[in-house]
């Protein structure tokens, strides 16, 4: 009798475990293609999207491509072959996906570009992101405010770093920052001693911290043996950490030679700790929980045959079409407000930042 009861229990458990995936499959499957695990923010993004989609009853397929373009193409092709209903894609190179997205479009699969615009494709349905131009504005404003340029102080030496040239967002970040910095450069209140300006000269392929650190090393040895750096525009926290390491390597970070004002983005833990320690000056917080929520709302609408909510239908032209977008607001974070924004807001626990 005991064995029969055990068998019945096992069958019941088996039926229950089968029922959950069957329910999720009935609601639809969503493929999520993320670029890399080398940045903490993409891990958080992936986890947030999966959590919210599964809570909404969807089956998910989350893949990370290790910043390898052929790998990401293969992953997306597999998702299309498996018959996902929606693709959520944070591309490595937004110009390389046209062919695979054409396959997706032919099968009626909707495509949501996640935080990185996918270019040269008419099969991108929607775009969920932050106001990327404003990100750059906030980065540059944190620098100009700290230097006191509005109060007439200066001149100061600044060097510029851009993001990856294959990431459309990098140009928005840079253009936003330069909308603030260029008037001061033109007036001589900010001096780029290297003369290196423009994304073709200051871009950092794949957002690689080691590349940024090596470039900062070169700038210091070539242009600053008899001068000091007062500020560095950095578009991403990972680059900021590499830049600061380079600066500390030649003596910055002491009472006699303080670190320059260094910006950042993504509020990654090492950079928030650096801000608290008085090294990196600022970062830009982009709440990936909210971005995931917007994305899930888009998925829900698409699955129900409705038009998702968007708030921008003019800005993001991808070479083929203007992609309907939902833009979230970024927030500048410094030592003065990190606790209010990041800890009180529930994004981090205080002990994570110690």
Swiss-Prot record:
> Got any disulfides in this one, which pairs?
none
Q: Which InterPro entries match?
A: Bact_Solute-Bind_Prot2 (IPR050555), ChvE-like (IPR049784), Peripla_BP_I (IPR028082), SBP_2_dom (IPR025997)
Q: Lineage of the native species?
A: Bacteria, Pseudomonadati, Pseudomonadota, Alphaproteobacteria, Hyphomicrobiales
What NCBIfam families does this protein's entry cite?
ChvE (NF040907)
This chain's function reads: Required for effective transcriptional induction of the vir genes by monosaccharides in response to plant signals and for normal growth and chemotaxis towards certain sugars. Functions as a periplasmic multiple sugar-binding receptor protein. It does not interact with a transport system.
Q: Name one Pfam family in it.
A: Peripla_BP_4
Similarity comment: Belongs to the bacterial solute-binding protein 2 family.
Q: Which Gene3D superfamilies match?
A: 3.40.50.2300
Extent of the signal sequence: 1-25
Q: What induces it?
A: By L-arabinose, D-galactose, D-fucose in the presence of GbpR (galactose-binding protein regulator).
Q: What is this protein called?
A: Multiple sugar-binding periplasmic receptor ChvE
Select a single GO molecular function from the record's annotations and give it: carbohydrate binding
GO biological process, alphabetically ordered? chemotaxis
Quick one: which gene encodes this? chvE
State the UniProt keywords alphabetically: Chemotaxis, Crown gall tumor, Periplasm, Signal
Subcellular locations according to the entry: Periplasm
Its GO CC terms? outer membrane-bounded periplasmic space
Q: Domain of life, per the record?
A: Bacteria
């Amino acid at each position: 009798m005991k064995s029969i009861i055990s068998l019945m229990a096992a069958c019941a458990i088996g039926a229950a475990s089968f029922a959950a995936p069957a329910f999720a499959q009935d609601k639809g499957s969503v493929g999520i293609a993320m670029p890399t695990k080398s940045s903490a923010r993409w891990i958080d993004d992936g986890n947030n999207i999966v959590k919210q989609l599964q809570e909404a009853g969807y089956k998910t397929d989350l893949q990370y491509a290790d910043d390898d373009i052929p790998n990401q193409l293969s992953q997306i092709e597999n998702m299309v072959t498996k018959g996902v209903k929606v693709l959520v894609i944070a591309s490595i190179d937004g110009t390389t996906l046209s062919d695979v997205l054409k396959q997706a479009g032919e099968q009626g699969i909707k495509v949501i570009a996640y935080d990185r615009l996918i270019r040269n494709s008419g099969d991108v349905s929607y775009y969920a992101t932050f106001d990327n131009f404003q990100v750059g504005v906030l980065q540059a404003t944190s620098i100009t405010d700290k230097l006191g340029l509005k109060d007439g102080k200066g001149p100061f030496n600044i060097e510029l770093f851009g993001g990856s040239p294959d990431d459309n967002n990098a140009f928005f970040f840079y253009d936003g920052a330069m909308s603030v910095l260029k008037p001061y450069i033109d007036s001589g209140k900010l001096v780029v001693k290297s003369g290196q300006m423009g994304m073709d000269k200051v871009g950092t392929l794949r957002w690689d911290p080691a590349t940024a650190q090596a470039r900062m090393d070169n700038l210091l040895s070539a242009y600053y043996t008899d001068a000091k750096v007062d500020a560095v525009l950095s578009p991403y926290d990972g680059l900021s950490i590499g830049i600061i390491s380079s600066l500390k390597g030649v003596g910055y970070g002491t009472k006699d030679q303080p670190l320059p004002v260094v910006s950042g983005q993504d509020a990654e833990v090492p950079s928030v700790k650096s801000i608290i320690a008085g090294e990196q000056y600022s970062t830009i917080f982009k709440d990936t929980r909210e971005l995931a929520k917007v994305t899930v709302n888009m998925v829900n609408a698409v699955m129900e045959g409705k038009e998702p909510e968007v708030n921008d239908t003019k800005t993001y032209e991808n070479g083929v079409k203007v992609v309907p977008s939902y833009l979230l607001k970024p927030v500048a974070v410094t030592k003065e407000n990190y606790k209010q924004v990041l800890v009180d807001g529930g994004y981090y626990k205080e002990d994570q930042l110690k």
